[in-house]
Amino acid sequence: MDATSRFLIVVGVDGSEPSLAALQWAVDEAKLRGGKVRVITAWHYPPVPSTVEDSGSNDSFHAAERLQSDALAAVAAEGTDITGMLVRDAPATALMDAAKDADLLIVGSRGHGGFAGLLLGSVSSHVAHHASCPVLIVRPGNRA
């Protein structure tokens, strides 16, 4: 980060409780550092025939758009520079790509697909091991 750039935090949001806790943490951290937040919402679905894919694509896109819009609205009054990006890709890939120029990547401990007994989900585990920047994994309710 050079003297003219602002601390960039990338955060993954899928609408789950851990991801919303990660978003709040990102906003709080950006306020402390005078930074900005880039919210990534990814959607990915298995390949299917094109006629069904087109319909599923629109449904998936609109669902992702709605949940990101709701998440951004929940933190809009916080006075932080926040932008959102909807990405059609696997969540881990989307986050890794979006965080290439980031100073910090924040994710929830588990997303919607997580098994209740696991401490980390597959996305948080993958980015923790492969991201090119520091990664913070947030569990709901674990705020200092």
Identify the role of each PLM range.
Residues M1-S5, P18, A73-L105, N142-A144:
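Structural beta-alpha unit
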Residues D2-E53, A98:
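Small/aliphatic-rich secondary-structure junction motif
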Residues K31, A76, H129:
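Anion (oxyanion) recognition and catalysis
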Residues R38-I40, T83-V87, L136:
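General small-molecule cofactor/ligand-binding pocket signal
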Residues S55-L67:
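A short acidic, glycine-rich active-site loop
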Residues Q68-L72:
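A conserved short alpha-helical segment within the catalytic HATPase_c
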Residues V107-H130, P140, A144:
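Glycine-rich, Arg-bearing micro-motifs that act as flexible, cationic patches
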